[in-house]
Amino acid sequence: PKYKDNIYNDFVERKPFRLKRNLHKGIGNWQPNADVMDLAASIQAVTEECLTELWIKASRYAGFGNNNLVYAGGVALNCAANKVLANLGLFDKIWIIPNPGDAGSSLGCIAANENKQINWNHPFLGHNIEGEYPVDAIIKELKENKMVGVANGRAEFGPRALGNRSLLADPRGPEIKDLVNKIKRRQKFRPFAPAILEEDVNDYFDLPIGVKNTPYMQYTAAYTHGN
């Protein structure tokens, strides 16, 4: 992250934490000759460091009878940062709503207005497409090394595809990565979300500290069986 110090100098005030300028409209031609990957890595490093400071501060308030954390805001979708933060080991439990950005805040507003807790059971709150989930058809296509598009049941509330509006593929074989990216028309560095039975997850992945499962695609995890 070669531009990390430049970002702090030009954009971030650390004590007290604040941005030196409004960045919602972008950064213009700042560092116009920078390699985009270097720039992205630097922004990620600064983000993780700033969030770490905030989490440490939050943990100081958590000792008053509750050591759990509810984490929200658009930055809570940053899976790489979430792994770093969880590995700090500051909280017993961490909960992130599947739609932690502005749209998800609407649920909090409703709960606050009604003065009631939300009975959260699942993230499938959107439009419903009726019918049986096509398990056998999906298995058949995956065995033939094909990609499968699924649109069944109620849509996920949030930006993550969690099974009801999803593209599924067999992860075995390097060519599948390029095929998924081609169909989605996205960059080659984009991440993928594995789906695995909860009881088998520790056999294949090294989850962050305190994370027993991640059903809403909120953390990165190291694969423990090589490349």
Model-derived features: positions:
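A short glycine/serine-rich beta->alpha loop
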Residues: 38-42, 67-68, 93-100
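Short, surface-exposed alpha-helical recognition segments that flank or form part
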Residues: 31-46
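Phosphate/ATP-binding catalytic cores across multiple sugar-kinase/actin-like superfamilies
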Residues: 42-66
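A general structural motif
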Residues: 46-48, 77, 131
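Glycine-rich phosphate-binding loops at beta-strand->alpha-helix junctions
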Residues: 68-85
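Flexible beta->alpha loop and helix N-cap segments adjacent to enzyme active/binding sites
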Residues: 1-25, 29-30, 82-227
